[in-house]
Amino acid sequence: MMDPQIERKLIEIMRVIHESDKPIGARAIADELNNRGYDIGERAVRYHLRILDERGFTRKHGYAGRTLTDLGENEMNDALIGDRFGFVISRIEEMAFRTTYNPETDKGDVVVNISYFDKDDFETVIELISYTAHAGYMISPRVRIFEEDSLEMSLPPGKIGIATVCSVTFDGLLLKAGIPVEPAYGGILQIENKKPARFLDLISYSGTSIDPIKIFMNRTPTSVLEVLEKGEGKILANMRQINSSAYEMTGKILKKAEKVGLAGCITLGEIDEYLLGAPVETGKFGAAVVGGINGICALEETGIEIETNPISTMLDYQTMKEI
């Protein structure tokens, strides 16, 4: 039986390959693993890749790098399921740490979601995402478009990619100010009279191996279009917990973010009190943050087919344009 530590590294390498939009090489894999706290060099990665090749889990594409086979995808999904319960939170913490955006200079990297859709739907996609963002139900009205021939992203034929700002950017802004943020829940938030009323459903980040927001997306229970048209309905939102000592500082940072249009609809609760029906631990307060993909949910409600990868990657905010 192979050393559990080697098996652990094999799974992490497979995750990196899985999350890449195109074939990825050993050097890039090593760099990404180092970002995630794994001290492993390019040579060691090549050794592990040979094992994955022999098992039929990876496919080599010349000098471009490797992708996962169907067998590899299944193995990654099945392996070490117990360990993956903390993976979503670790992913959020990692991306928050990599956030470098500064509202005062309007420069730096933000966390983004990547979605793919048919070229023919381009005008509708832009119009509805813009409408949703400017109404305050997304994190930012800035997006970045990736054409089919983009060198930065591998897209299926006939598809266009769009990057939208992820709510984890909020975690990053606070972390850079020395304020740790705890991902508590993802959920469905009821909107009444254009204001947050209560959470209708919640999934704890600590109790799932899948991003709760993605779970709710797949259930398609939102009514973002009704929120936009009537001011009432259901949207996606996250709930964060923050230590009570950071209450005033959190408010100040949010105001700075709002001035540059990077906040969306964020509701801060009171210390030691439930927020919109969601429980809060003693000595902390809650922050309800709108999901960065509510515009995508609105598009799905119209019948447009669109595939989304939440918490996908980092982008320079200045390369994103307001729509």
Curated annotation (Swiss-Prot):
Disruption phenotype: Disruption results in significantly increased transcript levels of genes involved in nitrogen fixation or nitrogen assimilation though growing under nitrogen sufficiency. It also leads to a significant reduction of the lag-phase after a shift from nitrogen sufficiency to nitrogen limitation.
InterPro entries hit by this protein: NRD, NrpR, NrpR_dom_sf, RNase_R_HTH_12, WH_DNA-bd_sf
Keywords, in A-Z order: DNA-binding, Repressor, Transcription, Transcription regulation
Alphabetized Pfam families for the sequence: HTH_12, NRD1_2
Record entry for activity regulation: Under nitrogen limitation, binding of 2-oxoglutarate to the NrpRI/NrpRII complex decreases the binding affinity of NrpRI to DNA as well as the binding affinity of NrpRII to TBP and TFB, which leads to removal of the complex from the operator, RNA polymerase recruitment and initiation of transcription.
Region feature NRD, mapped onto this chain: 86-323
Molecular function (Gene Ontology), one example: DNA binding
UniProt-annotated stretches for the region Winged helix-turn-helix: 11-76
Record note on quaternary structure: Forms a complex with NrpRII and the general archaeal transcription factors TBP and TFB. Interacts directly with NrpRII.
Family in the record: Belongs to the NrpR family.
PANTHER family per record: GLOBAL NITROGEN REGULATOR NRPR
Annotated function: Plays a major role in nitrogen regulation. Under nitrogen sufficiency, binds to the nifH and the glnk1 promoters, leading to repression of the transcription of the genes.
Protein name as it appears in the record: Global nitrogen regulator NrpRI
Gene name per UniProt: nrpRI
